[in-house]
A protein has these predicted regions:
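A short, flexible N-terminal coil/short beta segment enriched in small residues
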Residues: 10-14, 23, 34-41, 130-143, ...
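Zn2+-dependent cytidine deaminase-like catalytic core
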Residues: 31-130, 215, 241, 246, ...
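Generic structural signal for helix capping and beta-alpha/helix-loop junctions
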Residues: 105-106, 132, 298, 320
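Proteins enriched for Cys/Gly/acidic motifs involved in redox and nucleic-acid/cofactor modification
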Residues: 19-23, 112, 126-154
Length: 374
């Protein structure tokens, strides 16, 4: 096996931590000696041992003189675990092959520098693109202190998320819906607007056996969420946050008694200030959010600049209907040049349906738009 093959194995190991390591990154490590794999491990859960330590602990023989393959630069600071560079040095590892550099300001090249200063041969950027993609959530969060937000919706090929009567179950098939449940396990939070609660009364939990429920975040400017809704009735079992501009203590108390947490935020254009909400959630180590909002909230999120990714599940169906709901509403952009452009798109077939996943590239405001607003 060559360096890339060992790193691919480390990547597969890292993915086993998906949904459990937040707000830490997913990391995998492989220890090889004289062409044999003698140890492997991954970061299994937040607060527990890191991948490098687990890989060394699993070694079937002395790792002295071996090579370690690790998807992310080893840490060099004390957190919930001791520095991984110390563990590597103590084990007598001769060479370290790294996939991604760690943008965490506490690491940021220091881990690699320490290893080299102690005479260890370090090879960088092996399968870097794949390793970077694995931890795009962590990279965003650790550098911005705000959650990585993925806007998710299911629609027909004519762009409808419901019929003109409001019916939306089900647009996509079972395979696509199961994929969504895996996303709910993967993301630390799930966010909707009060309109979704009023229309569908969703539970917003992860239905995968053994999966982790995301923190539920409801944007509810005036606290209209029914006390008998599923999210409120189960708030003592699943963490639930109501983000609101309503400062009425009596209204807030009813939700708090049910187990909800009420975040009273500033208003922006008549709605919850989403930037302020993201800053607050980031401070609470919510590093990622699956946005399952309706057209109004989705537009507000784009307009606020908080969305990093779009996941569009597309069913080969046509609903039609002038009044049928679409995934993004709001004012819209006045000119094609002002569009929110998407890049690095990926297409995946899920049964009869398709998922298009793209990164959001925010536009510069065109001069003609600026003039039209004056």
């Amino acid at each position: 096996m060559n360096d890339k093959e060992y790193m691919r194995l480390a990547l597969q190991l890292a993915k086993k931590g998906c949904g459990w390591t937040s707000p830490n990154p997913m990391v995998g490590a492989v220890v090889a000696k004289e062409g044999r794999i003698i140890g492997q491990g991954w970061h299994q859960r937040y607060g527990q041992a890191h991948a490098e330590r687990n890989a060394l602990a699993s070694c079937t023989e002395d790792p002295q003189g071996a090579t370690m393959y690790v998807t992310l630069e080893p840490c060099c600071h004390y957190g919930k675990q001791p520095p991984c560079v110390d563990t590597i040095l103590d084990a007598g590892i001769h060479r370290v092959v790294v996939g991604s550099a760690d943008p965490n300001p506490l690491v940021a090249g220091k881990g690699i520098a320490i290893l080299r200063a102690h005479g260890i041969d370090v090879t960088e950027n092996v399968l870097q693109e794949e390793c970077d993609a694995l931890n795009k959530v962590f990279f965003h969060y650790i550098t911005t202190k705000r959650p990585f937000v993925s806007m998710k919706y299911a629609m027909t090929m004519d762009g409808k998320i419901a019929t003109y009567t409001g019916a939306s179950k089900w647009i996509t098939g079972e395979i696509a819906r199961n994929h969504v449940q895996r996303q709910r396990h993967r993301f630390r939070g799930i966010m909707v607007g009060v309109g979704t609660i009023l229309a569908d009364d969703p539970l917003l939990t992860c239905r995968i056996e053994g999966g982790r429920d995301p923190v539920r975040i409801i944007c509810d400017t005036h606290l209209r969420t029914p006390l008998q809704s599923q999210v409120v009735m189960t708030a003592k079992q699943v963490p639930t946050i109501l983000a609101t501009c309503c400062g009425d203590p009596e209204k807030q108390a009813a939700y708090q008694q049910a187990g909800c947490r009420v975040l009273c935020l500033e208003a922006h254009c008549g709605h919850v200030n989403l930037l302020q909400l993201m800053e607050q959630l980031g401070q609470e180590q919510i590093d990622s959010i699956l946005l399952e909002g309706g057209g109004t909230l989705n537009w507000s999120a784009l307009e606020s600049g908080i969305v990093q990714q779009v996941q569009a599940y597309i069913a080969p169906k046509l609903f039609g209907g002038r009044d049928a709901k679409v995934p993004i509403e709001g004012a819209g952009v006045p000119l094609p040049d002002a569009a929110f452009r998407l890049k690095n798109s990926r297409l995946e077939q899920l049964g009869k349906d398709f998922l298009i996943e793209s990164e959001v590239e925010y536009p510069c405001l065109p001069e003609s738009w600026k003039k039209s607003e004056q």
